[in-house]
Each structure stands twice: as structure tokens, then as C-alpha cells.
Amino acid sequence: MRPPPGSASAALGALLCAGAVALAAYASHVAEAAQAARFGMAAAFAFAHGIALIVLAPRRSSLAALVRVLVVLGVAGFSGGLCLAAWRGTGAPTAPIGGSLLIVAWLLAALDLWRRGDRR
């Protein structure tokens, strides 16, 4: 029996949310003040986009599949870049790329939702 379409995306979204909660706890209880803001921002973006992956998982269009891939890559670039920057104490060179991917993902999601309405 095959898993339903999008179940991997939904599972990844749930894992992103779990990681985001752990990261927020780290930011709140362990990180130094200078790091906490970056870790907190990374956690907020990872959590929000984890929920988005769960919500978008049932959509079956090829555009929705592209959106899910862009969300994963965008979160990796944005949140991952912020975390790396916080740990290293440097800039976050991948954050703008990740953020741009997230913007494109949301614009494509809007297009997919507009074209298909509430149909899945």
C-alpha cells in the first residue's frame, strides 16, 4: 500500500515544526542574547513553513509539488543560514536566497490556489 500523495511533505512539515520548537527552546534557554534573535527568527520561519507544508500536502498539482520543494529549500536557506550565522557569529549569506525562494513559493502557491480554487 502506497502512502497518500503529499504524505512525505506533511511528515517533513511536522518534523520542521518539531525542530522549530526545539530551536526556539535553545534560543530561549541556552543561546547568548546576540544569538537568540537569529535563532528565534529561524525557528519562527521553520515553524510557519512546517505548518504550510502540512496544509499544502494534499494538493496534487505539479505546481503545488514545486511549491513544496521551494518551501523546503527556502527554509533550509533562510533558517539554516540564520542558524549558521548565529553559531559562527558571521553574516547569513544564504538567508537572502532562502527568503527569495520562499517568496517565489508563496506567489506560486497563490497562483495554484487561484487557478484551482479549493479543489485538491
Name the predicted role of every residue range:
Residues 40-46, 96-103:
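Alpha-helical transmembrane segments of polytopic membrane proteins
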Residues 15-23, 37-62, 69-76:
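Core segments of alpha-helical transmembrane spans in multipass integral membrane proteins
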Residues 2-3, 26-43:
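Interfacial loop at the N-terminal end of multi-pass membrane proteins
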Residues 7-29:
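N-terminal signal-anchor transmembrane alpha helix
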Residues 5-9, 59-101, 107-117:
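Transmembrane helix-loop-helix
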